[in-house]
């Protein structure tokens, strides 16, 4: 009797331990649902597939799969045949048709309304309605799975410090072959910190950015109280100060706005802006100053056009115009540069007016994680003829005043950024940030890279060498993880083989683009009821939005209208750059990377 009782207890224990959905049996976005303790059922509804595991394509799906080119093939076509694309770009019907396909095919890969969060790996009202969570592209790995990645890989994940040191840490600066510059790097950091605002007091799965999109709270403040402290309440403008004839943000002392500065920073250098962390580096404060000037400039334009408007209407309409400018710059300059396409991307909300499209957005935790592009950062920051290491650069707004915005723009336009994919290019100064990114990913129980590749319609990697494109890091990965299906998302994105002469690998682009375009085009100003001249104060305001570019933003707000773009002016610089090619560890004694982590999100 005792033996039978023990066997029964063992059977019950085993049945409870083995969640049948841990193996991710349901393919092609089928939903796995447990049926008792040891059975599962795949819900294949509207996937285009059927069968026990949603693995058999329906007739129309089979045809689509036969005709559909691979993402790498599409990328090759879009980045070659420049003469053909010049013709396509000059024919509005063709350009509009292709752009519409780009927008719909990408944005339809994002669930809207949102589905999961870190605490709900099944659909629930809480996961839908609670805006304080980041949503999830894939549900978290269940707590009762035998390994951290479900059923694949080792029982314990490798030490995150080992992962960083062996695979991610820079040995020597690797410049980006696409010619990405520091104007791009700081734009990316400034732009994304309006919606990547992790609430670390509650945990990495929570956000303080409740707008979940492009609302410019990094300019105006997340709360009404912060906004009011930053506003002048005259002619719609934001508070400012004039130093040597140039407009800069006001100080913390003058606004009583909470900012993060070390105690030793002089009061006159503690500038106050919408995002509390933007005092961290002068590159962020550069963009904060440019957008402050742009807001007040737009207010002047609207005031002349509408002398009858009060302060509130001037402020609110200027904010909508700046949102429009931001989205246009991001699509037509920022994403255009990242893509490397000869096809010219276009910001035109009307392309989606006859499509099924939801004008809402929820930021996904995975989008936040994949955007940790710390390899962009150089070893030192070159401004005019001076170089600054990290210790000299951090929390040092005096550099901005000393050099001025014109020199900043000219210098950052010339300075090349690092390559993100390919591994071993995270600067030593931010290695603790990279480690924290891995640790937080584990807290959120992300599935493996291959599961995310399947989620975004990519073929899973079959070997470590296929992932990295070389042997040394592939061997390190295998020693750390044991199974290609158990490699973590964040490290994999950074060690992935880059596309030819590109900044990213396939996974980063094919995952990031849907999140990005859905977030941009899902903004309310892109909806039919908003996208009209009256929303922006008439044709004058509408024109500001429709003619915006990174160059016009700089020309309108920086003395001398210095040339700028998101890539270094001379493509040959990517071959010959030596500014940052020194061995990174040679100046480690000058760097205090922990200052980046203390009391704030690792997103920086």
Curated annotation (Swiss-Prot):
Annotated residues for binding of heme b: 374
Top-rank taxon, per record: Eukaryota
Active site residues of this protein: 193, 371
Pathway(s) annotated for this protein in UniProt: Lipid metabolism; prostaglandin biosynthesis
Pfam families: An_peroxidase
Sites of O-acetylserine modification: 565
Annotated catalysed reactions: (5Z,8Z,11Z,14Z)-eicosatetraenoate + AH2 + 2 O2 = prostaglandin H2 + A + H2O; (5Z,8Z,11Z,14Z)-eicosatetraenoate + 2 O2 = prostaglandin G2; prostaglandin G2 + AH2 = prostaglandin H2 + A + H2O; (5Z,8Z,11Z,14Z,17Z)-eicosapentaenoate + 2 O2 = prostaglandin G3
Location in or out of the cell: Microsome membrane; Endoplasmic reticulum membrane; Nucleus inner membrane; Nucleus outer membrane
Signal peptide start and end residues: 1-17
InterPro entries: EGF-like_dom, Haem_peroxidase_animal, Haem_peroxidase_sf, Haem_peroxidase_sf_animal, Oxylipin_biosynth_metab
Residue ranges the record marks as coiled coil: none
Post-translational note: S-nitrosylation by NOS2 (iNOS) activates enzyme activity. S-nitrosylation may take place on different Cys residues in addition to Cys-526.
Biological-process GO terms, alphabetical: brown fat cell differentiation; cellular response to fluid shear stress; cellular response to hypoxia; cellular response to non-ionic osmotic stress; cyclooxygenase pathway; decidualization; embryo implantation; negative regulation of intrinsic apoptotic signaling pathway in response to osmotic stress
Cofactor binding comment, as recorded: Binds 1 heme b (iron(II)-protoporphyrin IX) group per subunit.
PROSITE patterns given in the database record: EGF_3 (PS50026), PEROXIDASE_3 (PS50292)
Keyword Acetylation: yes
Keyword annotations: Acetylation, Dioxygenase, Disulfide bond, Endoplasmic reticulum, Fatty acid biosynthesis, Fatty acid metabolism, Glycoprotein, Heme, Iron, Lipid biosynthesis, Lipid metabolism, Membrane, Metal-binding, Microsome, Nucleus, Oxidoreductase, Peroxidase, Prostaglandin biosynthesis, Prostaglandin metabolism, S-nitrosylation, Signal
Membrane association type: Peripheral membrane protein
MF terms in GO: enzyme binding; heme binding; metal ion binding; oxidoreductase activity, acting on single donors with incorporation of molecular oxygen, incorporation of two atoms of oxygen; peroxidase activity; prostaglandin-endoperoxide synthase activity; protein homodimerization activity
Disulfide bridge partners, by residue number: 21-32, 22-145, 26-42, 44-54, 555-561
Residues annotated as binding substrate: 106, 341
Free-text tissue specificity from the UniProt record: Highest expression in kidney and urinary bladder.
Similarity annotation: Belongs to the prostaglandin G/H synthase family.
Role summary: Dual cyclooxygenase and peroxidase in the biosynthesis pathway of prostanoids, a class of C20 oxylipins mainly derived from arachidonate ((5Z,8Z,11Z,14Z)-eicosatetraenoate, AA, C20:4(n-6)), with a particular role in the inflammatory response. The cyclooxygenase activity oxygenates AA to the hydroperoxy endoperoxide prostaglandin G2 (PGG2), and the peroxidase activity reduces PGG2 to the hydroxy endoperoxide prostaglandin H2 (PGH2), the precursor of all 2-series prostaglandins and thromboxanes.
Quaternary data: Homodimer.
Record protein name field: Prostaglandin G/H synthase 2
């Amino acid at each position: 009797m005792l033996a039978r009782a023990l066997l029964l207890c063992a059977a019950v224990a085993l049945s409870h331990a083995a969640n049948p959905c841990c193996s991710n049996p349901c393919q092609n976005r089928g939903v796995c649902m447990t049926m008792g303790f040891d059975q599962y059922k795949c819900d294949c509804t509207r996937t285009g597939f059927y069968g026990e595991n949603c693995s058999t394509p329906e007739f129309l799906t089979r045809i689509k799969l036969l005709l559909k080119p691979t993402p790498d093939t599409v990328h090759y076509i879009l980045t070659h045949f420049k003469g053909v694309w010049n013709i396509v770009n000059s024919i509005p019907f063709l350009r509009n048709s292709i752009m519409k396909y780009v927008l719909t095919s990408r944005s339809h890969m994002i669930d809207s309304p949102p589905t999961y969060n870190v605490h709900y790996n099944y659909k629930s009202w809480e996961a839908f309605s609670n805006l304080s969570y980041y949503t999830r592209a894939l549900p978290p790995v269940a707590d009762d799975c035998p390994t951290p990645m479900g059923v694949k890989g080792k029982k314990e994940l490798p030490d995150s410090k080992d992962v960083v040191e062996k695979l991610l840490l820079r040995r020597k600066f690797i410049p980006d072959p696409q010619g990405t510059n520091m104007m791009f790097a700081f734009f990316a950091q400034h732009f994304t910190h309006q919606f990547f605002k992790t609430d670390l007091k509650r945990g990495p799965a929570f956000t303080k950015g409740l707008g979940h999109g492009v609302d410019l709270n990094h300019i105006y403040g997340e709360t009404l109280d912060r906004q009011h402290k930053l506003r002048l309440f005259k002619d719609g403008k934001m508070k400012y100060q004039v130093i040597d004839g140039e407009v800069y943000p006001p100080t913390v002392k003058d606004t009583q706005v909470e900012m993060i500065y070390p105690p030793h920073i002089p009061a006159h250098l503690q500038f106050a802006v919408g995002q509390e962390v933007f005092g961290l580096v002068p590159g962020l404060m550069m963009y904060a100053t440019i957008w402050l000037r742009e807001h007040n400039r737009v207010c002047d334009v609207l005031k002349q056009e509408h002398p009858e408007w009060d302060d509130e209407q001037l402020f609110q309409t200027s904010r909508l115009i700046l949102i429009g400018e931001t989205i246009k710059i991001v699509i037509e300059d920022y994403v255009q540069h990242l893509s490397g396409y000869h096809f010219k991307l276009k910001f035109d909300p009307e392309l989606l007016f006859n499509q099924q499209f939801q004008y809402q957005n929820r930021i996904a935790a995975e989008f936040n994680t994949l955007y940790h592009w710390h390899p962009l950062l150089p070893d030192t920051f070159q401004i005019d003829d001076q170089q600054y290491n990290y210790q000299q650069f951090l929390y040092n707004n005096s550099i901005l005043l000393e050099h001025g915005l014109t020199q900043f723009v000219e210098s950052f336009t010339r300075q090349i950024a690092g390559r993100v994919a390919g591994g071993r290019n995270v600067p030593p100064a931010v290695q603790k940030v990279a480690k924290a990114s891995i640790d937080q990913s584990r807290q959120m129980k992300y599935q493996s890279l291959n599961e995310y590749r399947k989620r975004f319609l990519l073929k899973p990697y079959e070997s470590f060498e296929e992932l990295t494109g070389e042997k040394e890091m592939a061997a390190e990965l295998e020693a750390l993880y044991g199974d290609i299906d158990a490699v973590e998302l964040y490290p994999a994105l950074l060690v992935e083989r880059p596309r030819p002469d590109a900044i990213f690998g396939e996974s980063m682009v094919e995952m990031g683009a849907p999140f990005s375009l859905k977030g941009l085009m899902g903004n309310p100003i892109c909806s039919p009821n908003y996208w009209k001249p009256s929303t922006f104060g008439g044709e004058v305001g509408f024109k500001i939005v429709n003619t915006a570019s990174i160059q016009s933003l700089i020309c309108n707000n920086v003395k001398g209208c210095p040339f700028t773009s998101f890539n270094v002016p001379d493509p040959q610089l990517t071959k010959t750059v030596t500014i940052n090619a020194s061995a990174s560890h040679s100046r480690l004694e000058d760097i205090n990377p922990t200052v980046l982590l203390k009391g704030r999100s690792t997103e920086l």
